[in-house]
Amino acid sequence: MRAEQLPLFPTEGEGEEYVLPPLKTRALTPESSLASAIGGFHDYMVRQDFTHNTIKAFLGDLRLLSRYTGLSKPVQEIGTQTLRDFLTYLRHHRGVPCTPKSYARRVTTLKVFFKWLAQEGVIPSDPAAALIHEPASSPLPQVLYDAQVESLLEVTKDRMEGDKVDARPHLLITLLLHTGLKKEECMNIKLSHIDTSDPPASILYVRYDDPRKRQKERKLRLPPDFAETLSLYLEEYAPKERLFECTPRNLEYVLADVAEEAGIKEGLSFERLRMTSAVRDYRAGTPSDKLREKLGLSKVTWREKEKQIKMLAGPAL
C-alpha cells in the first residue's frame, strides 16, 4: 500500500486539512506470514515518518530474511536462534560481501521489526532483543575550527566589499554555516522560499518536490545580515527563479577557491560546513530534538550523528 506524504507547507490549490486514509492492512496474528507482517510494518514506517531511504533499506533487509526463512513462515515460528543463523548466513555463507555497516543496519532492522511485532501484541516476546548489536562507526566528520571560520568570513567579506564586488561567496558560506543545509537542499532553494519581510529575521522555507521527502521540509532562520547580502547578490547575478542558477560543481569551485585564500588546506565542502553548523549549534545549547529537525535527519540516522556531534562539540579529554 502506498501512502501519501502530507507536505509541511501546502501549495497553491491545496486545502489545509488532511486526514490520513484508514489502514487497509489486515490485523496480524501469531500465525500471520512473514510477508503479511512486512506489509504491516511498511504501513507503520510510513505513518511514523521514516525516511524514504530508511524504508527502502529496511524492506530490502527483510526481503533477505524472507528469502532465508520463506515468505509464508509464520512470525511466531521465527525465534532468536533463527535470527542468529540468518545473520551468520549473511556474514559467511551468502556469497555476497556484508560490510560492517550493512551488518549493523540489518541487525537494527531486525530489532526494530520484531520489537514492533511484540509491542503490537502479534508475538508474545521479541526474538531480536537478545541479538548483539555491533554498530559500525563512521569516521568523525571534519569540521572547521573557530579560527578557520573567522578566516573564511574575512575572505568572503573582503570579496563582497572590494573593488570587484562578489557577494556570492559570503551569501553561500553564511547560509550553510547558519542553516546546515545539504547540497541538494541548497541547490533547490527558490527565491520564493526566502522571506525577507523582516530583514534582520529573514526566514528560509526548505521545500521538497518529491512527496517521499516532504517530512524533511522545515522553516529555518537566516543570518541577521542575509537580507543585505542577498540584495547585493541579486543585483550582481540577477537569478530569475532559483537562488543559485548554476551547477553544484560551480558552487564547489567557489568553496574551494575561498578555502584556498583562507588557508584551509584540507579544503571545504558542503558536508563540512553542514557539520560545522551542527557542532556550533550544539555548543550554543540547541536542544537535541530541535537540532535533528533543523538538519532534516530521521531518528534512525540521528542516533549515530548525535554521538559524533556531541563528541566534536564537547571538551577534550
Model-derived features: positions:
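Active-site/catalytic core of tyrosine-dependent DNA strand-transfer enzymes
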Residues: 221-265, 277
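Catalytic-site neighborhood detector that most strongly recognizes the C-terminal catalytic loop/helix
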Residues: 143, 295-317
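Short basic/aromatic active-site micro-motif
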Residues: 167-168, 247-248, 265-285, 295-301
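Conserved tyrosine-mediated DNA breakage-rejoining catalytic core shared by Y-recombinases
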Residues: 188-226
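Basic, Lys/Arg- and aromatic-enriched nucleic-acid-binding interface segment
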Residues: 151-183
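DNA breakage-rejoining catalytic core of tyrosine-based enzymes
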Residues: 123, 136-153, 213-224, 239
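N-terminal core-binding DNA-recognition domain of tyrosine recombinases/integrases
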Residues: 21-27, 39-140, 159
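Alpha-helix N-cap/helix-start motif at helix boundaries, enriched for small hydrophobics
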Residues: 55, 110, 172-173, 180, ...
